Amino acid sequence: MAANMYRVGDYVYFENSSSNPYLVRRIEELNKTANGNVEAKVVCLFRRRDISSSLNSLADSNAREFEEESKQPGVSEQQRHQLKHRELFLSRQFESLPATHIRGKCSVTLLNETDILNQYLDKEDCFFYSLVFDPVQKTLLADQGEIRVGCKFQAEIPDRLAEGESDNRNQQKMEMKVWDPDNPLTDRQIDQFLVVARAVGTFARALDCSSSIRQPSLHMSAAAASRDITLFHAMDTLQRNGYDLAKAMSTLVPQGGPVLCRDEMEEWSASEAMLFEEALEKYGKDFNDIRQDFLPWKSLASIVQFYYMWKTTDRYIQQKRLKAAEADSKLKQVYIPTYTKPNPNQIISVGSKPGMNGAGFQKGLTCESCHTTQSAQWYAWGPPNMQCRLCASCWIYWKKYGGLKTPTQLEGAARGTTEPHSRGHLSRPEAQSLSPYTTSANRAKLLAKNRQTFLLQTTKLTRLARRMCRDLLQPRRAARRPYAPINANAIKAECSIRLPKAAKTPLKIHPLVRLPLATIVKDLVAQAPLKPKTPRGTKTPINRNQLTQNRGLGGIMVKRSYETMAGAGVPFSANGRPLASGIRSSSQPAAKRQKLNPADAPNPVVFVATKDTRALRKALTHLEMRRAARRPNLPLKVKPTLMTVRPPVPLPASSHPASTNEPIVLED
């Protein structure tokens, strides 16, 4: 029962999602709501997976410095990987969560130089922290102060003087006497002078306009004049005047008016005092943060002095009593039963044996963390299309520590080529940036799974806006910049305004001429006619004339097909369909063919420039070239006079056989 009893100050696990790791929080308050439920006000602690990569690099450098200074024993890569899961970052962010979402207790300690990091791996539910994370400023700062050692920060203690040895140092330069206990005045005379000093201070506050506003009553003015700063000034006046009461009295009341001594309690306004109380409630006695966030116009010494004076006021005593009474009325502890509901990520296979559910889930897959194939329980992990899973022990580790036991290949470690890659805990840009480290077979599998078919279906109003608001939409310019945002609301509003005023004439529709099926079949057959088989032993002659043939203008600006760019053509049969894999066409040479992987298809298209295209580029004007670039799928119409036809270069007689339509093959 003690394990399910949670008190204020405990570090606990909170579950906000069935598939995400637990949240580590510290209970600050337990409050009962109006409907009877219990809510916990908690302090947020963050994992490494919750902060940016730049802050992770900063944490790594801090960890290396700690290991060097504390002389930590060496650890393996797997242990270092698991130690990152045990590191947390404290914050000053509070939130309220239902107490029913608590899933267990854990331990979080401040890392110090005497700790050995390996000990954290031997303990269950044990974490450490050394840095504080600010979710608003996105910064990491040290949680504990630094002790500065050296002659710049500490006083140099001189050697002890021997008996009878005199100190030759000038004491007047080293110290100043502020009070002489052997003065000629009696204690009664000193007390009477202090009473006169308080009366002078009260009279001075009555004459001061700002003080009369802050202390409107005589009682408050007398209380302010009785504080230490008035008494210290009176005793210092006696010391400076040689304990002559007449001279000291005339110093307290000069010709211009009585001397007014104020401390920090009087210098601060009521609004500044309220700000200080609010900051003290949020940050505690962290005066640097109080000054930085709430009172930047005050000095640190002024804030510290005001704090200790504020603790002597009646307001502080009343607040302290109210907080004590409120704390007594609040809950000190709460009992949360053990959570026994099944997890939605649990894999249940139909027809599996008892105790081995998930056995029929993609047989052959292993645990993404420990790579085991046997487990009493399996859990789905990562994106659904990845079909990744974790065993029972690795799932508990994932929920508690926010990572896998072993580093995956996407995290920089080397794994086997047959192991699946887990990307569920990475964002999409990180997974894409790490894809070169994967093998080609698994990368093709990932790409094939991620390619989803989608359909863009436009509404009637959108199709009307393309024509009516062409000046605002600029469809050609938008097509060249597909990632630039378009203000759809403004275009929709403008289209609604122009629609009633638009002409009612029907649009001219250009009918699409569709060729009959017989014509299409003839064209497909003509593209790849069957060739007679070449008998074995005969070498395919090389057509030297093909190397010097000029390319016609019709195929210069035509976009090349993927087969041409890939370096190997796809064979076609007589009916125009591509041949099945493994069947060699007669039109292809006997050289070794490379099977293309659809997942490795290149995204960019490469255009090879020849002498003809360069001459064509010079013949075109700038406007014609831009128009052709906007419509690369249309043939380019060029006047024959613009192109200079080169005379054919005579070739020497070749002893090779006649030219053939077979492609050129160069054997290695």
Curated annotation (Swiss-Prot):
It is found in: Nucleus. CDD domains: BAH_MTA, SANT_MTA3_like, ZnF_GATA. Residues 263-315 form the SANT domain. The modification Phosphoserine is found at residues 52, 54, 433, 435. Residues 1-144 form the BAH domain. Residues 145-256 form the ELM2 domain. Keywords: Acetylation, DNA-binding, Isopeptide bond, Metal-binding, Nucleus, Phosphoprotein, Ubl conjugation, Zinc, Zinc-finger. There is a cross-link at residue 492 (Glycyl lysine isopeptide (Lys-Gly) (interchain with G-Cter in SUMO2 and SUMO3)). There is a cross-link at residues 492, 508, 559, 595 (Glycyl lysine isopeptide (Lys-Gly) (interchain with G-Cter in SUMO2)). One of its GO terms (biological process) is positive regulation of DNA-templated transcription. Residues 412-437, 580-599, 647-668 are annotated as: Disordered. Pfam families: BAH (PF01426), ELM2 (PF01448), GATA (PF00320), MTA_R1 (PF17226), Myb_DNA-binding (PF00249). The modification Phosphothreonine is found at residue 534. A zinc finger (GATA-type) spans 367-394. PANTHER family: METASTASIS-ASSOCIATED PROTEIN AND MESODERM INDUCTION EARLY RESPONSE PROTEIN, METASTASIS-ASSOCIATED PROTEIN MTA2. Belongs to the metastasis-associated protein family. Component of the nucleosome remodeling and deacetylase (NuRD) repressor complex, composed of core proteins MTA1, MTA2, MTA3, RBBP4, RBBP7, HDAC1, HDAC2, MBD2, MBD3, and peripherally associated proteins CDK2AP1, CDK2AP2, GATAD2A, GATAD2B, CHD3, CHD4 and CHD5. The exact stoichiometry of the NuRD complex is unknown, and some subunits such as MBD2 and MBD3, GATAD2A and GATAD2B, and CHD3, CHD4 and CHD5 define mutually exclusive NuRD complexes. Interacts with CHD3. Interacts with CHD4. Interacts with GATAD2A. Interacts with HDAC7. Interacts with MBD3. Interacts with p53/TP53. Interacts with MINT. This is Metastasis-associated protein MTA2.
